[in-house]
């Protein structure tokens, strides 16, 4: 009798231990495998060797830098794993390391949004993304565990109304990256791209008299662009500088941008002889015009035009630098030089008089 009792007790203990082990195994399988994910974010033209970037490629002011940054990490099933908003004390070109605790052994999509508070977007049919049209309200409402609205974000556009409208304040920047997180802690260097085309005009008056700029236009500019890069492919050129080699543009009407400035509206912008005048930067939208881009300047009321045959496309983050020289002698015709940075620091048509 005593022996039977001991046998029963040992059997019960064995079953209990076995059950606990199975329970522990199941619990271990259900627990996600977590690792540290460190992300560093830089402007696309800063994330290259600095010796290869000209001064025109560097950010000119705080509007061209990161004033706020949002990082959203999305798992393979489309679930939001993290949504973090960062507001540094000063505008940055390179963000400090941001660490996330995430599930390992899987690919993830990382969405980066910069300067969202100054960005107004809408859907393709013109519907505002939020009550006030502000992107920040929409992004803030995306919670961890929610299904990420990739389709909605891919359809958002920025629009400029009016022939003199341009992007102002902190420029919109963004990007999405696919990363593969392994079984150990890992880090990635990511970049964001400015969703704008920048024009810089420098006018050098080498004539013997003071002149006045009374007008400036840029032909074939797009009224709308995708907020996020759309169908965009990047490649490093021979100088190691990242450039956009393929992208989609919003099918939209093109128009002639008319530069509006209080000085031009009144008496024009003074062009003193022997001096170089640089106009405030102009920020417009990317496009894919089937016709050549062109610009015109009116000096003392006389218009002069220049086509850009070597500038077939204007992807985002392009910086077009237009140098204009008014020669000392001649029939009054100006000479033009056009450079594009940071993607291509070589003059499209080297030298003046082209």
PLM segments and residue spans:
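Bacterial N-terminal signal peptides that target proteins for export
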Residues: 1-9
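C-terminal motif of bacterial Sec signal peptides marking the signal peptidase cleavage site
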Residues: 16-19
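Bacterial lipoprotein signal-peptidase II cleavage site
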Residues: 21-27
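Compositionally biased, non-globular sequence tracts
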Residues: 30-32
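Short, low-hydrophobicity acidic/polar segments
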Residues: 34-38, 42-199, 204
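Tryptophan-paired
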Residues: 58-131, 200-202, 207-316, 350-354
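Acidic, serine/threonine- and proline-rich intrinsically disordered appendage/tail regions
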Residues: 314-354
